[in-house]
Swiss-Prot record:
Official protein name in the record: HssA/B-like protein 52
GO terms, biological process: sorocarp development
Pfam families given in the database record: Coiled
Disulfide bond sites: none
Lineage: Eukaryota, Amoebozoa, Evosea, Eumycetozoa, Dictyostelia
Assigned protein family: Belongs to the hssA/B family.
Species the sequence originates in: Dictyostelium discoideum
Region (Disordered): 1-20, 72-91
Superkingdom, taxonomy of origin: Eukaryota
Length: 91
């Protein structure tokens, strides 16, 4: 059981209501699409996360917004897990 911890501080108008996104997970359920989540998870298609490539994916469903846990729980606007190109943070 490895512990992943990452803090991505991003200041960009594209992040909607998030300028700093912290991702914490413990790699127990890191499967399917959770590993593909960009660390930034900002912008419309995870463009900001593309350069960071932290791929942490919140293994236990812990997220910042209390949203869905289906894909590792990258807290989007309401946990809707938008995107579909590996960016599981739909804003």
């Amino acid at each position: 059981m490895t512990l992943f911890s990452s803090i991505s501080s991003i200041s960009n108008p594209m992040t909607s209501s998030k300028s700093s996104i912290a991702s914490f997970g413990s790699g127990t359920s890191m499967g399917s699409n959770s590993i593909a989540c960009g660390g930034g998870c900002g912008g419309s298609d995870g463009i900001l996360g593309l350069g960071l490539g932290l791929s942490l994916g919140l293994g236990l469903g812990l997220n910042l917004t209390g949203g869905s846990r289906s894909r590792g729980g990258c807290g989007g606007s309401n946990g809707s897990m938008g995107g579909g190109n590996g960016s599981c943070c739909g804003i």
